[in-house]
Amino acid sequence: MNTFADYILEEEELGSKMEIAYYLSKKEKVFFDKSIVFKTEIARLFLNYSKIEVDKNFVLTACLLCNCKKVDNAQDINKIHTYAKEGADYLREMGFGKRFCKVCEEINRYSNSNPRERESDILELVDQFGGMLLDRPERIGFKPDEALVLLEHRNLKDEYNRYLHTFIEFVNFLEKIQINDLVSMTALRRLVKIHNETEELTKFIQKVVYEFEPKIDKLIAEQNEEIAEEMFSKVEDANRPLFSEETTRKIMAHIHDDPRMKQEGQV
């Protein structure tokens, strides 16, 4: 008999996977809100950009479920320190494998689990960066460049994350992508705007999967094409002689006058 773990891992379409996680949250009272969908979309974009050799389906499923025992209360310090471990234990009961649960536990570093899995480093970056972009009761969301500075020089100042610099490159790349609707704005700002203006979780999922994703994927493809064309335009004709005709004459004259060449019988 298939477990819940089998069911959600076998579903490779991200929108359907999000719906499964949503219905689990209703049945089991686990944590699943718009911020999870928001962060998972950032994870999807990062995986597409970076081409890191990981199982994309595995990572996105973990991104949807790793916060399952989180509480929406920043003042509950004890819970902040334990929710990742509690979530991993819960997911193990739901049929997920040991490594999947370890990856979810390592979304933060409170359990001191080492050595860290590489997928955990992806979850950590997405969770911390994505969280800083969103408003919280005690503060408004940070701009992407501000969030990157805090991520690198505060949150991970004394920690090693193998994908940090790749993630910074990814965010800087994404900040160059403009989405034009009624008002032109960057891709991340647009995603934040959709998050803030869409109250219902199910509607937010639909807007992300069926409106935002096709648009941003097309724009990224166009941006990559422009970059490739720019690179190729800088490459001169491969059949062009290495030296100009004038340079060739000078070199040949020099060789002709060089006594070493005459001694070796090359002239």
Q: PLM features: residue spans?
A:
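Acidic/His-rich, divalent-metal-binding segments that scaffold phosphate/diphosphate chemistry
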Residues: 1-92, 253-267
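Histidine/acidic-rich helix-loop-helix segments that form or flank divalent-metal centers
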Residues: 59, 63, 91-126, 130-237, ...
